[in-house]
Amino acid sequence: MGVNKALIKQAVKQILVAIGEDPEREGLRRTPDRVANMLEELTNGREENVQYTLFEGSSNMVIVAGIRFSTLCEHHLLPMLGVTHVAYIPSDKVIGVSKIPRIVVKYSRMLQLQERLTRQIMNEVSSATGSGDVMVLTEAYHTCMMIRGVRSASPLVSMAYKGKFNDSSLRLEFLEYIRPFRLNKFLT
């Protein structure tokens, strides 16, 4: 199911009129095109097909930390900006290091809830690696919360984990490792 850019353009023009703007005035004339192109880019994750190649690995924890992402909140269609940290314990093989950020991009390129995004990344990493031992921590600023309503710039942190990461000492080891890559240090 692709993006219907013509319908988006028509809807954006109607929104501009509904808020008292003239969609034909200078500065807004190309806004419907820009919004349609933006939404096409930011919601094409369902079309992503990440190919995985497995390599010889070890049984030690693999961590990819500080993966920057942006996605749109499905409630307000406003951006969430954040970082994701992923760890897994290989069963005996590992996937290429670039594949984990690709998984993050795949699921962030659709309308999202942060908690669902975190679970989807965990499940895809588990499926791709064949590991039942995966942990994902996602931190994000929600612009819907920053610019409207409560107007708070507090980030949301969500975690999903399974397998050996149910052991709190392993979670703490992961959290200690990713500390330098956490959102408050990484996006500033």
From Swiss-Prot:
Give the enzyme's main class according to its UniProt record, as a single word.
Answer: hydrolase
Q: Where is the signal peptide?
A: none
What top-level branch of life does the organism fall under?
A: Archaea
Q: What EC number(s) has UniProt assigned to this enzyme? A: 3.5.4.16
Show the catalytic activity. GTP + H2O = 7,8-dihydroneopterin 3'-triphosphate + formate + H(+)
Q: Which GO terms describe its molecular function?
A: GTP binding; GTP cyclohydrolase I activity; zinc ion binding
Looking up Gene3D superfamilies in the UniProt record yields: 1.10.286.10, 3.30.1130.10
| Biological pathway | Cofactor biosynthesis; 7,8-dihydroneopterin triphosphate biosynthesis; 7,8-dihydroneopterin triphosphate from GTP: step 1/1
Any one cellular component term from GO for this entry?
cytoplasm
Q: Describe the subunit structure.
A: Homomer.
NCBIfam families, per database record: PRK09347.1-2, PRK09347.1-3
Q: What PANTHER family does this protein's entry cite?
A: GTP CYCLOHYDROLASE 1, GTP CYCLOHYDROLASE I
- What is the protein name for this chain? GTP cyclohydrolase 1
Q: What species was this sequence derived from?
A: Caldivirga maquilingensis (strain ATCC 700844 / DSM 13496 / JCM 10307 / IC-167)
